[in-house]
UniProtKB/Swiss-Prot annotation:
<keyword id="KW-0963">Cytoplasm</keyword>
<dbReference type="GO" id="GO:0048471">
    <property type="term" value="C:perinuclear region of cytoplasm"/>
</dbReference>
<feature type="topological domain" description="Cytoplasmic">
    <location>
        <begin position="1"/>
        <end position="15"/>
    </location>
</feature>
<dbReference type="GO" id="GO:0016020">
    <property type="term" value="C:membrane"/>
</dbReference>
<keyword id="KW-0472">Membrane</keyword>
<feature type="topological domain" description="Extracellular">
    <location>
        <begin position="484"/>
        <end position="485"/>
    </location>
</feature>
<protein>
    <recommendedName>
        <fullName>Solute carrier family 2, facilitated glucose transporter member 10</fullName>
    </recommendedName>
</protein>
<dbReference type="GO" id="GO:0022857">
    <property type="term" value="F:transmembrane transporter activity"/>
</dbReference>
<feature type="topological domain" description="Cytoplasmic">
    <location>
        <begin position="299"/>
        <end position="305"/>
    </location>
</feature>
<feature type="topological domain" description="Cytoplasmic">
    <location>
        <begin position="127"/>
        <end position="132"/>
    </location>
</feature>
<feature type="topological domain" description="Extracellular">
    <location>
        <begin position="154"/>
        <end position="165"/>
    </location>
</feature>
<keyword id="KW-0812">Transmembrane</keyword>
<dbReference type="Pfam" id="PF00083">
    <property type="entry name" value="Sugar_tr"/>
</dbReference>
<feature type="transmembrane region" description="Helical; Name=6">
    <location>
        <begin position="166"/>
        <end position="186"/>
    </location>
</feature>
<feature type="glycosylation site" description="N-linked (GlcNAc...) asparagine">
    <location>
        <position position="161"/>
    </location>
</feature>
<feature type="region of interest" description="Disordered">
    <location>
        <begin position="528"/>
        <end position="555"/>
    </location>
</feature>
<feature type="transmembrane region" description="Helical; Name=8">
    <location>
        <begin position="278"/>
        <end position="298"/>
    </location>
</feature>
Length: 555
């Protein structure tokens, strides 16, 4: 094993705790909002602003976070993000005004976005090639666990006086543990991949004996500017296009909006009592956790490319199935948001409410349970999670029902179609959790040179957030233009394009060091790389594998 067991455990802990903080912060607002909207007499617009504040903070972090990560280091960025989580939590606990709540949530969003990028990059650099996929995927598991913990806290603290302060404050606990854990890990982990890759010597021991300064690989001699991402130097333009393709297809396959209709689908198959809704949410949570565990187990065995392809194929089939079935199973796509106060909203506020609202259930109890369904379903990579969390919380601020409940008198074939829809949605969630969810971020943490990896990762991440916003804010217009069924079918077409993109352009990176991956991208074209990816898993005992590839494809 490349890393000593304590170091490996610490690396896994850092990845897991980072995901827990991310998931908890996105999920906890659902319970807190139930109290806050009464305490502060919030309008719909104010509730939506409070929920969306995390999203805007995260988007801001994705724009400037790469500079922080590359200039001050991955570990420093993670440590700083924990301190920012602490600051944001204190603001939320101590505040007595609505606008300070906004400031606190924006601060939290900024922190968890920085942490998510830095964690994925840091862990990918500190572990051996055969461990990288598993440990980076642990971040996804942490997100799922964090959301489940937030749901439990929402339940247990619901009757406590000023419960929202405790809800926000508990985020300090996992952040503090992550802060302590990472103090025992090296500050410059990328050197680990250069040293004695087939022995048990790790970076920490080499740094202590001074051996790390005797050799500096030329990969880290190279300096890059941000503009190099768009130039042909070392095939950087190709790498950028690959990263952008992955994050854009991750969003444009419709993943956020499909899950906005989870409550409608559950109601259409008869989950209308409290116990049934809880069962549905638990079932979806089990599917999510199981799928994430599958991704962890097979990321370094089956490989990133295989899981991306398999996940995207299942997603395409599932979303197409939902589209076809929804021609028969009527689901009301109307969105509404009712204010808890008597204050009038401006037309602008009303428009924002319509754009950001989702399908609502009939009672506040069902709203809360549907909210948990969304949270469990959306335990995925950073931007996707943030937007889904927004949808969850907006369930809570609804007062009017627009769901068409299933009737017990419906014919059996109609019931079968409802269940097909439900199973298709679960398959979609599962496939995303195995493929696009974790694999996108593993690949992004691998394909860029170390000197610009943070900025490149953040650049792609900003497009992910932007695409997530775009697809959400245009969803109503698309439905109004072509209908809900055709919207889902359109996502299916995008899924087909994503399959082609992955098949023809995404290489396999399992089993390779980050330096070998960088060399391959620097010395040959992407199509050549894909053709040779079948032999990637077994590296020669000496000498870099790209030499053999170069002989096969002389330029």
């Amino acid at each position: 094993m490349g890393l000593s067991s304590p170091t490996l455990i610490l690396a896994a802990t850092v990845s897991l705790l980072g995901g827990i903080v991310f998931g908890y912060e996105l999920g906890i607002i659902s319970g807190a909002l139930l109290v806050l909207k009464t305490v502060y007499q919030l309008t719909c617009f104010e509730q939506e602003a409070l929920v969306s504040a995390v999203l805007f903070g995260a988007l801001l972090a994705s724009l400037i976070g790469g500079i922080i990560i590359d200039r001050w280091g991955r570990r420093t960025a993670i440590l700083a993000s924990n301190l920012v989580v602490l600051a944001g939590s204190i603001i939320l606990i101590a505040t007595s005004t609505f606008w300070w709540l906004i400031v606190g949530r924006v601060t939290i969003g900024f922190a968890i976005s920085i942490s998510s990028m830095a964690c994925c990059i840091y862990v990918s650099e500190i572990v051996r090639p055969h461990q990288r996929g598993m440990l980076v995927s642990l971040y996804e598991t942490g997100i799922t666990v964090g959301i489940l913990i937030s749901y439990a806290m929402n339940y247990f603290l619901s009757g406590v006086n000023e419960s929202w302060k405790y809800m926000f404050g508990l985020a300090i606990v996992p952040a503090a543990f992550q802060f302590i854990s990472i103090l025992f890990l090296p500050s410059k982990p990328h050197k680990l991949n250069f040293w004695e890759q087939d022995t048990d010597d790790g970076f920490i021991e080499l740094e202590e004996t001074g051996e790390a300064g005797e050799f500096k690989p030329d990969t880290y001699d190279r300096q890059y500017t941000f503009l190099d991402l768009f130039r042909s130097k070392d095939n950087m333009r190709t790498r950028t296009l690959l990263g952008l393709g992955l994050v854009l297809f991750q969003q444009f396959t419709g993943q956020p909006n499909v899950l906005y209709y989870a409550s409608t689908i559950f109601q259409s198959v008869g989950f209308q009592s409290n116990s049934s809704a809880v069962l549905a949410s638990v079932g979806l949570g089990v599917v999510k956790v199981a799928s994430t565990l599958i991704a962890i187990c097979f990321a370094d065995k089956a490989g990133r490319r295989i899981l991306l392809l398999a996940g995207c194929i299942v997603m395409t089939i599932a979303i197409t199935g939902i589209g076809i079935v929804s021609f028969t199973v009527k689901m009301d796509s109307h969105r509404d948001c009712g204010s808890v106060t008597g204050r009038n909203m401006s037309s602008g506020e009303s428009n924002v409410s319509q754009l950001l609202g989702i399908v609502h259930a009939e009672t506040s109890t069902i709203n809360t349970l549907d909210n948990s369904v969304h949270q469990l379903a959306m335990a995925i990579r950073s931007p996707s999670l943030a937007n889904s969390a927004s949808s969850n919380h907006k369930d809570l601020i609804s007062q009017n029902s627009t769901v068409l409940p299933a009737s017990p008198e419906l014919p059996s074939n109609y019931t079968i179609l409802n269940w097909i829809t439900l199973l298709s949605m679960m398959a979609f969630v599962s496939a995303f959790s195995i493929g696009f969810g974790p694999m996108t971020w593993i690949v992004l943490s691998e394909i860029y040179p170390a000197d610009i990896r943070g900025r490149a990762f953040a650049f792609c991440n900003s497009f992910n957030w932007a695409a997530n916003l775009l697809i959400t804010l245009t969803f109503l217009d698309v439905i109004a233009s072509i209908g809900l069924s055709w919207t889902f079918l359109l996502y299916g077409v995008v899924g087909l394009l994503a399959i082609a993109f992955i098949y023809f352009f995404i290489p396999e990176t399992k089993g390779q060091s980050l330096e070998e991956i960088d060399k391959q991208f620097s010395t040959k074209r992407i199509l050549q790389k894909r053709e040779t990816s079948k032999g990637v898993g077994k590296r020669p005992s000496s000498g870099p594998p790209y030499q053999r590839i170069g002989k096969a494809s002389p330029s």
